[in-house]
């Protein structure tokens, strides 16, 4: 049975941990508000651009740019796995890594060649245990401040576009956590190249009208497709950032509650041990007095 001193030290240690988790919860809540606002603000543009491209693609048939139609094969797949740079966020990183592993297994069972580009340190650490041989690159987001992912998304988009044009892969799929609400972040796999509109993207109703484009549909697509890919990556980074903070806030809230329960249980154990020690000392005093 632990001594009173041990119990007292443990209570103090848990109280210190509780203060840390509470502080982390408050910081995550503040960051979540900003991240959620940024993700929400980016959605209308991304959705509208996806709708415009969907309408343009419908008029070009099979003769469009390769970023839209592909290069005629789907043998080599590049998985872009986006997770957080930091842990202590519940199952946020683990769920994305799990989806990535399932996707890798599925593609390999179909005889496909798989490559992995990681964005964020935590996902890379998890996948490295089994799939480090598939890694082709890594993007570090630790220097990004205040959800300003514009430069990072542009860099990744250019990397993917150039890699596709150089024949390094045939299909690129982005795996990230889509932010639904504070309690729900959904691991999602979205094909980036060849470009496809995200599931649930709005469609522009032309009312039966036929638009004439100047310049041509092909020229517009050539200009818009790289921007569309960059926009989808930026949106995913913002969604992932909001989901990370929401998951961390929830995890730290649970940790704070658990610490409170543990302190209560330890205090009860401490009081019982102290009472038992006092009772024992009283018995010894009484026994000694009777012996006299």
From Swiss-Prot:
GO molecular function, one term: proton-transporting ATP synthase activity, rotational mechanism
GO BP term, pick one: proton motive force-driven plasma membrane ATP synthesis
Bilayer topology term: Peripheral membrane protein
InterPro entries named in the record: ATP_synth_F1_ATPase_gsu, ATP_synth_F1_gsu, ATP_synth_F1_gsu_CS
Keywords: ATP synthesis, Cell inner membrane, Cell membrane, CF(1), Hydrogen ion transport, Ion transport, Membrane, Transport
Assigned GO CC terms: plasma membrane; proton-transporting ATP synthase complex
Primary localization class, coarse: membrane
Gene3D superfamilies listed in its UniProt record: 3.40.1380.10, ATP synthase, gamma subunit, helix hairpin domain
Pfam family, one: ATP-synt
Localization in the cell: Cell inner membrane
Assigned protein family: Belongs to the ATPase gamma chain family.
Subunit structure: F-type ATPases have 2 components, CF(1) - the catalytic core - and CF(0) - the membrane proton channel. CF(1) has five subunits: alpha(3), beta(3), gamma(1), delta(1), epsilon(1). CF(0) has three main subunits: a, b and c.
HAMAP family documented for this protein: ATP_synth_gamma_bact
Function: Produces ATP from ADP in the presence of a proton gradient across the membrane. The gamma chain is believed to be important in regulating ATPase activity and the flow of protons through the CF(0) complex.
Protein name: ATP synthase gamma chain
């Amino acid at each position: 049975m632990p001594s009173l001193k041990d119990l007292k030290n443990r209570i103090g240690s848990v109280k210190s941990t509780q203060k840390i988790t509470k502080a982390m919860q408050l910081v995550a809540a503040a960051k979540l508000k900003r991240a959620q606002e940024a993700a929400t603000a980016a959605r209308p543009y991304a959705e509208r651009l996806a709708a415009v491209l969907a309408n343009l693609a419908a008029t070009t048939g099979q003769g469009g740019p390769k970023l839209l139609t592909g290069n005629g094969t789907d043998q080599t797949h590049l998985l872009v796995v986006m997770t957080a740079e930091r842990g202590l966020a519940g199952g946020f990183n683990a769920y994305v890594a799990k989806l990535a592993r399932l996707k890798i297994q599925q593609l390999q069972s179909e005889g496909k060649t798989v490559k992995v580009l990681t964005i964020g340190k935590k996902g890379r650490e998890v996948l490295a245990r089994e799939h480090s041989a598939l890694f082709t690159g890594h993007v570090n987001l630790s220097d990004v401040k205040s959800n300003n992912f514009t430069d990072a998304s542009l860099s990744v988009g250019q990397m993917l576009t150039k890699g596709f044009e150089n024949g390094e892969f045939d299909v690129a799929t982005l795996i990230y956590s889509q932010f639904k609400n504070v309690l729900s972040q959904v691991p999602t796999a979205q094909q980036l190249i060849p470009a496809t509109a995200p599931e649930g993207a709005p469609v522009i109703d032309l009312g039966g009208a036929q638009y004439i484009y100047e310049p041509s549909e092909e020229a517009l697509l050539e200009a818009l497709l790289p921007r569309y890919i960059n926009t989808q990556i930026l949106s995913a980074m913002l969604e992932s950032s909001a989901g990370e903070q929401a998951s961390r806030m929830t995890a730290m809230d649970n940790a704070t509650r658990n610490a409170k329960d543990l302190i209560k249980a330890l205090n009860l154990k401490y009081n019982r041990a102290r009472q038992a020690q006092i009772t024992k000392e009283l018995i010894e005093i009484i026994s000694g007095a009777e012996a006299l």
